[in-house]
Curated annotation (Swiss-Prot):
Changing residue 1205 to A: Does not affect elongator complex activity. InterPro entries: A-sol_ELP1, Elp1, ELP1_b-prop_2, ELP1_N_b-prop_1, HB_ELP1, TPR_ELP1. Residues 1214-1228 have a biased composition (Low complexity). Changing residue 551 to A: Does not affect elongator complex activity. It is found in: Cytoplasm; Nucleus. This is Elongator complex protein 1.
Length: 1349
């Protein structure tokens, strides 16, 4: 396991040295000139160059006949058709084509010839008639051209003339710059001394370099080699830059991928630094900018040759160095330079010292470096600073090699006049993923060597490996058998078998040994080439044989691995792209170039499985069985289907013909899952329990689903080991990481639970930090029924304690461990639940019922089992204590009682210590006190951090007191005041209620409990009632106090309390009966207080009944709008004059109040309706101006903008949050600001965003007031009519009806608030909508018919 790299990467790379390069497809064709067809003797056209055309996905070739100067350009389309784009003669004979480019966007061909001509050919894309092609010479370099190269963006042409001038031209052949190459250029230095580093890396001058060369010569003369007698601070030698005999002395040009710089490599004659009278030839390269300005020159490197290639997506420049005269250290190396010309690493190509390297070239994504030799092409990849030879192509007379500019692993090269197109792909050579053979075996090709790492045995970080074996030649493909003990590798013409006796022998250090080298001639013809290899079990090997147009598969019997025999050769009649074993190694499966996947059995019988919509670069095949929740383990062949899963080059994942997902980077399968990684850095799982495949849902942010796991950026699948629930990934930098995905771990846990293997399930949960609740939650009834089995299997006390103490109330199988086995494949992934709000947490606690608690249920069941068996009780004492302490609420009293019963003091002390570990020691201390066991409390206190000076005196005092007093003191200390009162009352049980009891009741508000204690002793209960009545009066609960006083016979106090409670009938009844002399004063006091509270009818009743004051009574009835009672009282008292003196003025006053109210209401309705219409019109015309207007600023708040201020949007201004707080949910308003905001909302100041809401609410308040006034208005109308004030009555009724009609006509318009205006944002930044304000119902005014005119 390697720690994650937290540094970001500018570009996601998917290369991996754990994967091998294989040849997917190889095609070739030989272009022939149309003018020479049928007349080969007259003209001899040769293939000069070819390029990829990305616009039409075609290949453009240049054919030439140098003896007559004829040129022909042909375009070969993907469908096999051929277009002749140009055919012309050049003016010079025996010329050499240095550069050719096809500008498909402008239909132009550009040729650069060695003798100096730059020619363009512009063709007609419609007619494609070469006769209509316009040929132009754009310019000529008089002394010829040595090298030419177009930039990747096809905008700039860099050339070096034979006069050693670097010329840069634009696409329109306009000169950009010209620079003459001088020897002094090599003295330019961008080599920066940073003031640190090793001594031998620092510049010391040419004198020091000469001394080093002399030291090297002296060492050689003495016969010493290697590091013997070598000064470790001095290098063997300092390079002079001498060229080798195999250097072509050619000038080469290479552009950087971004086209900002290009490099020019050439041979220079420079003075010898040791002997200035002599000169040496030195190979060096110069770096120029796009504008042709010299940027840097390379340092001297002895043996560097002409090959040059700038890494397209990096800063390194690759070349070849041939090291000679170093004895055992002689080598041919690929060397790298930085842009400033300094060396930056190298690797040994392992080539013979006399083998010539023609060129080197990077592919478009910089993952592969092609080293081109005369008769073969080697492909190298790198990871973890190690270079691997992954593939070798064999040809003869290779003239050029080119990578496709867009398809990363498509290569084109020419040999003997043929154009060869080869497609490569990464292939993970690995063993089976089927239990129990899932050793995670990975085979890595590195030239002749096959590196083997069984990841289940050892996660060896690359480039290291566990075991290896070496073959006679470079390996083209390799495969592993079902048992992981036999390996097959193919060289150019040989099939090699290696084996180990057993995996156990490999563990002991034994490497696989080659047991058979099986030549190709033994089972096929020489025209067939060996391409791929795969196993059927351990007994049969399939070898993919290739010819130019067809593929065949040779099946070999290897039961005697030392003598393989040919079973049959299966004719496919199409080109095979990929060959591999199926999931269970019972068949071979292959894909043809049209996307068809077929299965091949051991007898050579073929069966088509599916045809992918697109060609895939990697695939797996497995038989998938349809299962359901009801019939989980039963399946048959009829309910299954062979399914092929494949990834295309553009990352599409298919299950047969169904597109499952896009942006997929790697895949693997197990017996239960399809696993794949994505470009979004996720590892996803698909259950293989149904053949009904559908597109997978998108993975959104915040997903919490067992089928999705985040992984390190750019990681890909290397292997899956189901028996260990592990997945091995490789990060972009090359390190391996073993992870244990939750879905695989949970699958194992669930399987163990259902099989009642609780200990295995527990160990897995404990190892992988899975919540132990799942042991119960996944099958609750099964768990309870087998609880004793569970306890016996677990066996260990600490494991049981861990299980019980970690229990929670949540059902984890419905939350974080929700099973997805039978969830629909297209169903959205589960999302992380929002955190509970404070209110939700509060309500959850409030609604908690211990009777239905899951934790309590499990703890009770455990206690029942353990307490029923004496052996269990003795062995699992700590577990019993844990169960008591884990109950909700915790039952510490029962745990402490159990501990107090222990006879062994050491065991008791140990149990107390353990209980204090489980719970807060202060809580345990108080629980011990609640048992009234002072010695146990002392034992607990000693485990705490309490000061002994505090608890020892207290405990001593308790010990010294008698039992009842001790219990009282303990309960008083613990705050159990009711129990303390009980103990206190028991102390003086036979006497009267003591002052101590009274004081304790008063100090702790225990009146009701005191009344309950003395329920059967009325005398003592009355004492409590007396102090309770005083307490009620002091708390303004006058009615209850008055009743209590009346019960006790304290009528004076009762009458006063009734007066305070405004209970005038009760107060007057006591006054009349017991205190007649105080009737008048009590009545006047009541009238005053009732009048103050607008209870005019009650006050009038007292005036009339107890003071006989008719006039005042009539006036009070009129104030209450009870004109009918006022008239009745006046007439009944035979005081008709009061009708005119009191009733009529009262009617007039009532008329004035009602009339004024109606006028105000009508004016308010009209004005507010008008303002509402203005606001809504303004909002509709310009919403931003409406919502974005400035809100009121406090006088003491600066409104000047600052760099840190946050601009409010019209959305957040209405919700009271800034853009930042609305997004993060973090409210930065202080409580003071919030209160200010609420006050502004309530005021609804004109011009603010709160005005509309305020106006609507104001109309609502008006309607409520009208409804309240309506009964009074009816009484006023009736009273006016009875007193013949018909005009006033008519006016009141008419105005009231008009106001109500006005409201009815406009109430819906007033209350129509838009959804946008109801939008709010809560404290968590979530948008919500306040409820719509219901439109109030306007009821009709009950009209009087006599004034309804």
């Amino acid at each position: 396991m390697v720690e994650h790299d937290k540094s970001g990467s500018k570009r996601q790379e998917l290369r991996s040295n754990m994967r091998n390069l294989i040849t997917l497809n190889k095609g070739k064709f030989k272009p022939t000139a149309s003018t020479a067809e049928g007349d080969e003797d007259d003209l001899s056209f040769t293939l000069l160059d070819s390029v990829f055309d990305t616009l039409s996905d075609s290949i453009t070739c240049v054919l030439g006949s140098t003896d007559i100067g004829a040129i022909e350009v042909q375009q070969f389309m993907k469908d096999g058709s051929r277009n002749v784009l140009a055919s012309f003669n050049i003016q010079t004979f025996d010329d050499k084509l240095l550069s050719f480019v096809h500008f498909a966007d402008i239909n132009q061909l550009v040729f650069v010839f060695e003798q100096g001509d730059i020619i363009t050919a512009t063709y007609d894309p419609v007619s494609l008639d070469p006769a209509e092609t316009l040929i132009e010479i754009m310019g000529t370099i008089d002394n010829g051209i040595a090298a030419a190269q177009w930039s990747y963006d096809e905008e700039t042409l860099a050339m070096v003339t034979k006069d050693r001038n670097v010329v840069v031209l634009s696409k329109l052949f306009e000169p950009i710059s010209e620079y003459h190459l001088e020897v002094d250029d090599l003295k330019i230095s961008k080599h920066v001394t940073v003031g640190w580093g090793k001594k031998e890396t620092q510049f010391r001058g040419k004198g020091a370099r000469a001394m080093e060369r002399e030291a090297l010569a002296s060492l050689k003369a003495s016969g010493l080699v290697g590091n013997q007698l070598r000064d470790p601070t001095m290098p063997y030698m300092v390079d002079t830059g001498d060229v080798t005999a195999l250097d072509s002395h050619e000038i080469t040009i290479s552009w950087r991928g971004d086209c900002d710089y290009f490099a020019v490599s050439s041979v220079e004659e420079v003075p010898d630094e040791d002997d200035e009278t002599k000169s040496i030839k030195r190979r060096a390269f110069r770096v120029f900018s796009r504008e042709g300005q010299l940027d840097s020159a390379s340092e001297p490197v002895t043996g560097m040759e002409h090959q040059l290639s700038w890494k397209p997506q990096g800063s390194l420049i690759a070349s070849i160095q041939r090291k000679t005269d170093l004895g055992e250290e002689d080598s041919v190396d690929v060397i790298f330079f930085e842009r400033n010309g300094l060396r930056h690493g190298e690797f040994d190509t392992r080539l013979p010292l006399d083998e010539k390297v023609e060129s080197v070239c990077w592919n478009s994504n910089s993952e592969a470096l092609a080293v081109v030799l005369a008769n073969r092409i080697q492909l190298w990849t790198s990871k973890n600073y190690h270079w691997y030879l992954k593939q070798e192509l064999y040809a003869s007379d290779i003239s050029y090699v080119k990578w496709h500019p867009e398809k990363d692993f498509t290569l084109m090269f020419s040999d003997a006049g043929f154009i060869n197109i080869v497609d490569f792909a990464y292939k993970m050579a690995q063993g089976p993923t089927l239990e129990p053979f899932d050793n995670g075996t990975s085979l890595v090709v590195d030239g002749r060597t096959v590196n083997i790492t069984p990841l289940a045995l050892a996660n060896v970080p690359p480039p290291m490996y566990y075991r290896d074996f070496e073959t006679p030649g470079n390996v083209l493909d390799v495969a592993c058998s079902f048992s992981n003990e036999i390996y097959a590798a193919i060289n150019k013409d040989v099939l090699i078998f290696a084996a180990v006796p057993s995996i156990e022998e490999m563990k002991k250090g034994k490497h696989p040994s080659i047991v058979c080298e099986f030549p190709k001639s033994e089972f096929t013809s020489e025209v067939d080439s060996l391409r791929q290899v795969a196993f059927i079990n351990d007994s049969i090997v399939g070898v993919l044989l290739d010819t130019d147009n067809l593929s065949r598969i040779a099946l070999l019997d290897i039961q005697d691995i030392t003598q393989p025999t040919l079973i049959t050769i299966v004719e496919v009649y199409d080109k095979i792209v990929l060959l591999r074993s199926d999931f269970d190694y019972n068949h071979l499966v292959y894909e043809t170039r049209d996307g068809t996947v077929c299965q091949l059995d051991a007898e050579g019988q073929l069966m088509e499985i599916t045809k992918f919509p697109q060609l895939v670069r990697d695939f797996r095949v497995k038989r998938v069985h349809n299962t359901s929740a009801e019939d989980d383990d039963n399946w048959s062949a009829e309910s299954s289907e062979l399914v092929a899963f494949g990834i295309t080059n553009n990352g599409k994942l298919f299950a047969n013909q169904v597109l499952l997902a896009s942006a997929v980077t790697s895949l693997e399968i197990t017996d239960s899952f399809l696993l794949f990684t994505t470009a979004q850095h996720n590892l996803q799982f698909v259950h293989l329990n149904s053949t009904d495949f559908k597109p997978l849902p998108l993975v959104e942010e915040g997903v919490e689903d067992e089928r999705v796991r985040a992984i390190e950026r750019g990681s890909i699948l290397v292997s899956v080991i189901p028996s260990k629930s592990s997945v091995v990934l490789q990060a972009t930098r090359g390190n391996l990481e073993t992870i244990y995905p939750r879905i695989m771990v949970l699958a194992e846990v669930r399987k163990n639970i259902m099989a009642k293997r609780y200990k295995e399930a527990f160990i897995v949960c404990r190892t992988h930090r899975i919540n132990l609740d799942i042991l119960h939650d996944y099958a609750p009834e099964l768990f309870i029924e087998n609880l004793e089995v569970f306890i016996n299997q677990i066996g260990r006390v600490d494991y049981l304690n861990l299980f019980i103490s970690c229990l929670s109330e949540d059902d984890v199988t419905k939350t974080k461990y929700k099973e997805t086995l039978y969830s629909g494949i297209s169903k959205s992934f589960g999302m992380e639940p929002a955190p509970l709000t404070e209110m939700q947490i509060y309500m959850k606690k409030k609604m908690f019922d211990p009777k239905t608690s899951k934790v309590n249920k499990i703890c009770d069941a455990v206690l029942n089992v353990l307490l029923s068996n004496p052996e269990y009780k003795k062995k699992y004492l700590q577990t019993i204590i844990t169960a008591y302490a884990s109950q909700n609420p915790q039952n510490l009293s029962a745990a402490l009682k159990l501990i107090s019963e222990l006879e062994n003091s050491e065991e008791k002390d140990s149990c107390v210590t353990y209980l204090c570990f489980l719970q807060d020691v202060n809580v345990v201390y108080k629980s011990a006190l609640s048992l009234y066991d002072v010695s146990l409390a002392l034992l607990v206190a000693q485990k705490s951090q309490m000061d002994p000076r505090e608890y020892l005196p207290f405990l001593q005092e308790l010990q010294d007191n008698e039992p009842l007093r001790r219990k009282f003191l303990i309960d008083d200390y613990l705050g159990n005041y009711e129990k303390a009162l009980e103990h206190l009352s028991e102390i003086d049980k036979d006497g009267n209620v003591s002052e101590e009891v009274i004081d304790y009741v008063e100090s702790h508000d225990l009146y009701k409990h005191g009344l309950a204690l003395y329920r059967y002793d009325s005398e003592k209960q009355n004492v409590i009632y007396n102090i309770y009545a005083k307490h009620l009066s002091s708390n303004q609960m006058y009615t209850d106090a008055a009743v209590a006083y009346e019960m006790l016979g304290k009528l004076k106090e009762a009458m006063g309390a009734y007066q305070s409670a405004k209970r005038w009938r009760e107060a007057m009844s006591i006054a009349v009966q017991k205190f007649p002399e105080e009737v008048e004063s009590v009545a006047e006091e009541l009238i005053s207080s009732l009048t103050f509270e607008h209870r005019y009818v009650d006050a009038a009743d007292i005036q009339l009944e107890y003071l006989d004051n008719v006039k005042e009574a009539v006036a009070l009835y009129c104030k209450a709008y009870r004109y009918d009672i006022a008239s009745l009282v006046a007439i009944k008292a035979k005081k008709d004059e009061l009708l005119e003196e009191v009733v009529d003025p009262g009617l007039g006053e009532g008329f004035g109040i009602i009339a004024e109210l109606l006028a105000d209401c009508k004016g308010q309705i009209n004005s507010q309706l008008r303002r509402l219409r203005e606001l809504r019109a303004k909002k509709e015309e310009n919403p931003y101006a409406f919502y974005g207007q400035e809100t009121e600023q406090a006088d003491d708040v600066s409104v000047a903008p600052s760099e840190t201020s946050t601009q409010e949007s019209f959305f957040t201004r209405y919700t009271g949050k800034t853009g930042g707080t609305a997004k993060t949910g973090a409210s930065r308003r202080t409580a003071k600001n919030k209160r200010r905001e609420e006050r502004k909302r309530a005021r609804g100041k004109k011009g603010t965003i709160y005005e509309e809401e305020y106006l609507v609410q104001s109309v609502g308040r008006l309607i409520e007031r009208l409804n309240q006034t309506k009964p009074d208005a009816v009484r006023v109308v009736e009273g006016l009519c009875r007193r013949n004030m018909r005009e006033q009555a008519h006016q009141i009724q008419k105005n009231f009806v008009e106001v109500l009609d006005l409201l009815k006509a406009n109430v819906k318009e007033i209350y129509s608030i838009s959804e946008k205006d109801r939008e709010r944002v809560n404290e968590n930044g979530e948008v919500y909508y306040i409820p719509e304000i219901p439109v109030p119902e306007i009821h009709d005014f009950p009209k009087s018919h006599i004034v309804d005119f």
